């Protein structure tokens, strides 16, 4: 969920195919490739009684990336500890000018007592380089009772987007309005046009089409669990 982190680049890469790299375990460690930035992002580790997390790049062929994160977090019930994620590198684009955001994602989780979500995290602003005003999350999994930000605790709508049923929640996160689409069942092999979710919000929930899409990320937010390994075997996205 949080993405405004100090940019400490662990390495740089060319557009050529990349193989596995050593895991990174620092709070703000990152790895960059031609199109993606992989974050360990332990933004909420202070909420935990104890724990750790490491994230690593497995491969990147220029269009599709594979990566993993291993974590254990205890304490701080109901509080997110981190957001290991991959961000797509692109120029901010006004929603009215978007044609498509095709994405595929194959992932799996192993471990004990997992409370976490697996989600896309998109941000928009009224200008290309302004502060974020909307956060759009697309939850492919709500594990162990994990729940989204919500003003009421109840879904505000149950739309069908991309051929799949979702419960839509809304609430504030600082200065941002957060919309969270939560899948009706865990989806470990996902394919959709993410622009369909943005179109729905513009048409049905009043999000202005003048907003700029500034960030597209995908990853997992742990609340608690032991010896968890989250593996993305294949992930792709583009913005057009």
UniProtKB/Swiss-Prot annotation:
Record field: catalytic activity: xyloglucan + H2O = xyloglucan oligosaccharides
Domain of life assignment: Eukaryota
The name this protein goes by in its record: Probable xyloglucan-specific endo-beta-1,4-glucanase A
Keyword Secreted part of the UniProt annotation: yes
Alphabetic keyword roster: Carbohydrate metabolism, Cell wall biogenesis/degradation, Glycosidase, Hydrolase, Polysaccharide degradation, Secreted, Signal
Signal sequence annotation: 1-15
GO cellular component: extracellular region
Record's keyword annotation contains Transferase: no
GO molecular function ontology, one term from the record: cellulase activity
GO biological process, one term: cell wall organization
Subcellular location: Secreted
Enzyme Commission number(s) from the entry: 3.2.1.151
Main function: Catalyzes endohydrolysis of 1,4-beta-D-glucosidic linkages in xyloglucan with retention of the beta-configuration of the glycosyl residues. Specific for xyloglucan and does not hydrolyze other cell wall components.
Similarity comment text for this entry: Belongs to the glycosyl hydrolase 12 (cellulase H) family.
